[in-house]
Amino acid sequence: MTEISDLDRQIEQLRRCELIKESEVKALCAKAREILVEESNVQRVDSPVTVCGDIHGQFYDLKELFRVGGDVPETNYLFMGDFVDRGFYSVETFLLLLALKVRYPDRITLIRGNHESRQITQVYGFYDECLRKYGSVTVWRYCTEIFDYLSLSAIIDGKIFCVHGGLSPSIQTLDQIRTIDRKQEVPHDGPMCDLLWSDPEDTTGWGVSPRGAGYLFGSDVVAQFNAANNIDMICRAHQLVMEGYKWHFNETVLTVWSAPNYCYRCGNVAAILELDEHLQKEFIIFEAAPQETRGIPSKKPVADYFL
């Protein structure tokens, strides 16, 4: 029982945006690893479920997401990666989601995004944040080891395929995804890389991605993939959409974006997708958490003699 009460205390602490001890992070990651190692590369998820896109360390907006979508375990969640980088609270964001995963493994599914990578986090903020908040890179190491265990995709009721980025020219079937050895750093190319980096594009066939990794894929590619795997649609994140969600290719691909006012300056709204037990869809749109609920000190107004 003490293990669960410890975990509940850590969850409460993290919900208040307070750090847990380095030793607690180590133990949490060890428990998470035991759970995640059992999950498939195409993790099965049952409806009803609420599907979420990128969070990017925007902790107070994640709290807003839980406010509008319901808390774990009452709501069953699927997060499609990119928990860290760019926002101010990547540590608290990822550790809260991980603690919820350990506490309620059947009520929250976490899949890997392109930012769940050692290389990317050293550039876009998570590494520096761990160093600043803990005084060493040990916590970053624990977390990035867990990244390697995160599933690459999920399938809801056998009908909705969820992945962070998109499709790969090396992959025609879900079974091919199931055979990938995922327990590694995100490679620079190949099928695992493509799943996390690719984007839909109004084109046919495959195109070169301006991101420098993954591919652009067209409507014909999607039609083929969906038919071959007997699925209705692909749900993904990875691209900022100002309205929070966006349909592509006659509603066969959906982008969901869950970081409102991205980077604290883009002015976009965010969305989550609620699927009921019949896979009926309802989008919940939400805005950034109000400034006064946040931990960032609001900038002092510039004195008028500078204007």
Curated annotation (Swiss-Prot):
<feature type="modified residue" description="Leucine methyl ester">
    <location>
        <position position="307"/>
    </location>
</feature>
<protein>
    <recommendedName>
        <fullName>Serine/threonine-protein phosphatase 4 catalytic subunit</fullName>
        <ecNumber>3.1.3.16</ecNumber>
    </recommendedName>
</protein>
<keyword id="KW-0904">Protein phosphatase</keyword>
<feature type="binding site">
    <location>
        <position position="82"/>
    </location>
    <ligand>
        <name>Mn(2+) 1</name>
    </ligand>
</feature>
<keyword id="KW-0539">Nucleus</keyword>
<feature type="binding site">
    <location>
        <position position="54"/>
    </location>
    <ligand>
        <name>Mn(2+) 1</name>
    </ligand>
</feature>
<keyword id="KW-0488">Methylation</keyword>
<feature type="active site" description="Proton donor">
    <location>
        <position position="115"/>
    </location>
</feature>
<feature type="binding site">
    <location>
        <position position="238"/>
    </location>
    <ligand>
        <name>Mn(2+) 2</name>
    </ligand>
</feature>
<feature type="binding site">
    <location>
        <position position="114"/>
    </location>
    <ligand>
        <name>Mn(2+) 2</name>
    </ligand>
</feature>
<comment type="function">
    <text>Protein phosphatase that regulates many processes such as microtubule organization at centrosomes.</text>
</comment>
<comment type="similarity">
    <text>Belongs to the PPP phosphatase family. PP-4 (PP-X) subfamily.</text>
</comment>
<dbReference type="GO" id="GO:0005737">
    <property type="term" value="C:cytoplasm"/>
</dbReference>
<dbReference type="InterPro" id="IPR029052">
    <property type="entry name" value="Metallo-depent_PP-like"/>
</dbReference>
<keyword id="KW-0206">Cytoskeleton</keyword>
<feature type="binding site">
    <location>
        <position position="56"/>
    </location>
    <ligand>
        <name>Mn(2+) 1</name>
    </ligand>
</feature>
<dbReference type="InterPro" id="IPR004843">
    <property type="entry name" value="Calcineurin-like_PHP_ApaH"/>
</dbReference>
<comment type="subunit">
    <text>Serine/threonine-protein phosphatase 4 (PP4) occurs in different assemblies of the catalytic and one or more regulatory subunits.</text>
</comment>
<dbReference type="GO" id="GO:0005634">
    <property type="term" value="C:nucleus"/>
</dbReference>
<dbReference type="InterPro" id="IPR047129">
    <property type="entry name" value="PPA2-like"/>
</dbReference>
<keyword id="KW-0963">Cytoplasm</keyword>
<keyword id="KW-0378">Hydrolase</keyword>
<dbReference type="GO" id="GO:0000724">
    <property type="term" value="P:double-strand break repair via homologous recombination"/>
</dbReference>
<dbReference type="GO" id="GO:0004722">
    <property type="term" value="F:protein serine/threonine phosphatase activity"/>
</dbReference>
<dbReference type="GO" id="GO:0046872">
    <property type="term" value="F:metal ion binding"/>
</dbReference>
<feature type="binding site">
    <location>
        <position position="164"/>
    </location>
    <ligand>
        <name>Mn(2+) 2</name>
    </ligand>
</feature>
<keyword id="KW-0479">Metal-binding</keyword>
<keyword id="KW-0464">Manganese</keyword>
<feature type="binding site">
    <location>
        <position position="82"/>
    </location>
    <ligand>
        <name>Mn(2+) 2</name>
    </ligand>
</feature>
<dbReference type="Pfam" id="PF00149">
    <property type="entry name" value="Metallophos"/>
</dbReference>
<dbReference type="InterPro" id="IPR006186">
    <property type="entry name" value="Ser/Thr-sp_prot-phosphatase"/>
</dbReference>
<dbReference type="GO" id="GO:0005813">
    <property type="term" value="C:centrosome"/>
</dbReference>
